[in-house]
Regions:
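Extracellular/periplasm-exposed beta-strand and loop segments of Gram-negative cell-envelope proteins
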Residues: 2-8, 15-24, 60-64, 86-87, ...
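Conserved small-residue
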Residues: 19-25, 29, 36-135, 254
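Membrane-embedded beta-strands that build the outer-membrane beta-barrel scaffold
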Residues: 27-37, 45-53, 141-147, 152-160, ...
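C-terminal beta-signal and terminal closure region of outer-membrane beta-barrel proteins
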Residues: 11, 18-27, 71-97, 103-108, ...
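Extracytoplasmic gating/loop element in the C-terminal half of outer-membrane beta-barrel translocons
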Residues: 108, 161-247
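Membrane-embedded beta-barrel scaffold of Gram-negative outer-membrane proteins
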Residues: 1-13, 42-47, 52
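Membrane-proximal, glycine/serine-rich, low-complexity loop/turn segments characteristic
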Residues: 63-73, 87-88, 92, 99-101, ...
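Outer-membrane beta-barrel and related beta-rich outer-membrane complex signature
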Residues: 1-6, 53-72, 163-189, 252-261
Length: 288
């Protein structure tokens, strides 16, 4: 891992230099299962499943052994300039260090009310806590199925993960409004405002609340296809296959954002506002 380390005075133009000094440890188990539960003259069914359990931890970041040392690595769009995620020895990369949200007796979040962990009467950087949650999933898996009956064939593929946490940056940045959202004038208003009920300006620390740290475990059905093959359509035993397919069919997740699978981003901060497209297609294949 690359990390900035402090250098002796006069050894460089600055007091820090980017160095390949860090190290990381990965432990895990991979497995796969492929079964054919049905195999007859007309019917065929095969199912495949693969999974990976993984445990990733940083083991070294700099030359010192200070257990309190950590490197800030990821920020969010609002707030007071501090970063949200850190690299720290003993934790997964990009572990979140948020503030802990306070709630009322009905379970609703209280705006600008965060846990004062050090008891000094102020909310400062010292009140953040080590969540132990990161955007690196603890479990990956994939699923495929193939079914055929005479000239018909059907297939699907999907994948997902579990123990996967992301910070909903869009929700954090748009969690408050002094507009009456119940007036029916803004049907496309950000859903997060209805969820929080915040109406006052957010304090800087509110944007870093664990209210916006969500379990984004999901299952995505990547594609399905259904086809029919016309056989012996010519003197040369040709075939014609007509097929329908769909990609990005659906996603099952409790995540409140647009898509739990952040595109082009592995640091766990979701600021994507464009949905992933769903595609339908019809194909005709001729074989002679």
């Amino acid at each position: 891992l690359l990390n900035e380390v402090i250098t002796p005075m006069g050894a460089n133009f600055g007091n820090k230099i980017l160095t390949n000094i860090g190290s990381m440890q990965n432990k895990g188990i991979e497995f796969s299962l492929n079964v054919v539960p049905v195999q007859t003259k007309d019917w065929h069914l095969s199912i495949g499943f693969n999974g990976t359990f993984q445990d990733t931890k940083i083991t070294k970041l700099n030359t010192s052994e200070d257990p309190r040392y950590m490197e800030q690595v990821v920020g969010i769009s609002k707030g007071t300039g501090s970063l949200l995620s850190f690299h720290k020895v003993g934790y997964a990369p990009y572990t979140y260090f948020p503030y802990q949200q306070l709630y009322d007796s009905n379970g609703n979040p209280i705006q600008n009310a965060l846990v004062d962990r050090d008891g000094d009467g102020k909310i400062t950087e010292l009140d953040r806590y080590e969540s132990g949650k990161s955007p690196i999933p603890g479990f990956y898996y994939g699923l495929n199925l193939k079914l055929s009956y005479k000239n018909w064939d059907f297939g699907l593929n999907g994948h997902g993960n579990a123990d996967y946490w992301i910070f909903n940056d869009f929700a954090s940045a748009n969690s408050t409004s002094n507009v009456d959202i119940n007036a029916g004038l803004l049907p496309n208003f950000a859903k997060v405002v209805k969820r929080t009920g915040f109406t006052k300006p957010n304090a800087g620390q509110q944007y870093y609340s664990d209210l916006f740290l969500e379990n984004a475990s999901f299952f995505r059905l990547d594609d399905i296809n259904l086809g029919y093959t016309f056989r012996d359509v010519s003197d040369y035993n040709g075939t014609i296959r007509l097929a329908f397919s769909a990609q990005n069919v659906f996603v099952i997740s409790k995540y409140s954002g647009i898509d739990p699978e952040i595109q082009g981003n592995n640091n766990g901060v979701d600021n994507v506002i464009w949905p992933r497209p769903r595609t339908y297609s019809i194909r005709v294949n001729f074989t002679f």
